[in-house]
């Protein structure tokens, strides 16, 4: 093993004490890239001389191949270039500095390793780095260019320009995805023919200015310009071509191999190439072009390897070169396609607006402050990325299944416009409302402890059913303590019927009504039903509550909820447990409507029904106006919420997020639109208000409801029943 020490600069000799070892000759010979018109006897340092054409060739002559096989670490040798740095245009700094780096490193990487440059760049925040090579290339350089592409004796003039916006990721550079691949250099004039502005940076938009573009062999011209980063972001939306003088014309899909070393001028069409009908077609073309680039470049590279040389090469060298060529990385193509698609989609929605709205929009949009523009650009970028994630093209098969898709889409747009006028909403605010309502913005997850607690309390919730001589119905109730159950006063009215004297109510209820607490999956057996005693001492029509008493049937009463009383919450989540529409026992989680928002809520619901009256079929409560429900809106004894519980849920207990009993569900009005039932208003009266009214009306009953002896008696009776059931189960004899 021989050792080799790089001696590019004497000042670096002390830093490079570690000698580099030369590995043995193997078949994995590194494929070397040389510039055009390079003499055979050139010293094989990391820096290559470049002719005026700046074309990079992949052919390697016999002498260079032999040297590579003897020294495979040749490409690891350091390259260098000089530069001057002018941070302030008023103060000219003529100091010359030298930067070093490996051939595979980028220009920016070599500059960052220089202490002077790294120190000066700290003070140039939010500025573009403009690099001009003034000796050999005579053009503005991309900072991502590998050092192997630079001719020897390259000298850079580096200046800083103020960036207008911060959406570009720092310094504009293109990362070299595959340093082992051959690079192509060509020039593009910074000012276009038809459209003059083709670059992002104003400092580059000067007469006579040229941009030096580097690209990987096998790429298209369009891909190289889009990935360069210095051209305008919507360059992919236009039809353009590159001209060499007045003779040769190159299109977007032309290969960069054809323009190597040439100076080209861009001619952009005045009309944008992508209209609404061409968006999907263009996206598909870009996807296929990406695959073709990758496939074609690999084929060309393999053909280049297998092509025999006139001077002759061994099969081992050809085989090793074929193995050393890795497949191209498609990440930059994906980024390129994403960057091109975002402005297309934005342009599509802008073009879909009527002309008068576009004029208004253009008048309103003024150039904001720099900090404001930075925030706007970030928001636009995030929205575009989210739009791309959810963007999907519907194929013809799906469209045939939905022939009315366009009509439905127009109907939705019309509805949104009417809602914006009616509610005085901006499109952004309207979108955020729908996003909150339907986009899972509000977390509705429930802890397991709360679920277990609610499941235990559901044992106290009963299904009440009655049949008063053909007058049938059902409702919900719950056990408060002992055999006392709470339900709604209007439920009692439904049981006994109209124009029935109150003195007859207890007997009628006792004969026609029954309660079960086990209707959770299947219809309960007769043993699981409780009758009701002819007892009705306390009820209140204003608070809509009534207290009934269960008749003993040998079974223990369910546990009561009298220990779980809590004040009603002003906001947050609540849970209702009941039997909506006479169905099995269910739990509904919903949100509380704060007192100050009730006045906005109910008139809006009424307006919704009136505005969409032409689209409804029946049962729209058109008699409600903005003055409706004013007593309930400002009533502090009520708790308002949005629930899906409808008929049959009156008398359901309402629990807060901690599982405490806060209200008795009493009032709910619904209307039918089409085949769907919508809630108009839902109320429950707080348990604190109900208990205070009971204490004023019948203090002895209030004490009985809070008597611990009733609960103790029920617990002992429940234990006796469970022990009797255990004794009844006898073991089988063998």
Swiss-Prot record:
Residues 1-10, 17-32, 310-321 have a biased composition (Basic and acidic residues). The active site is at residues 490, 544, 650. There is a cross-link at residue 284 (Glycyl lysine isopeptide (Lys-Gly) (interchain with G-Cter in SUMO2)). InterPro entries: Peptidase_S1_PA, Peptidase_S1_PA_chymotrypsin. Its EC number is 3.4.21.-. GO terms for molecular function: serine-type peptidase activity. Pfam families: Trypsin_2. GO terms for biological process: DNA replication; proteolysis. Gene3D superfamilies: Trypsin-like serine proteases (2.40.10.10). The keyword Hydrolase applies. Keywords: Acetylation, Disease variant, Hydrolase, Isopeptide bond, Protease, Ubl conjugation. GO terms for cellular component: chromatin; cytoplasm; nuclear lamina; nucleus. Residues 1-32, 285-321, 712-734 are annotated as: Disordered. The modification N-acetylmethionine is found at residue 1. Widely expressed. PANTHER family: SERINE PROTEASE FAM111B, SI:CH1073-475A24.1. Belongs to the FAM111 family. It is linked to Poikiloderma, hereditary fibrosing, with tendon contractures, myopathy, and pulmonary fibrosis: An autosomal dominant form of hereditary poikiloderma, a genodermatosis characterized by mottled pigmentation, telangiectasia, and epidermal atrophy. POIKTMP features include tendon contracture, myopathy, and progressive pulmonary fibrosis. Serine protease. This is Serine protease FAM111B. It comes from Homo sapiens (Human).
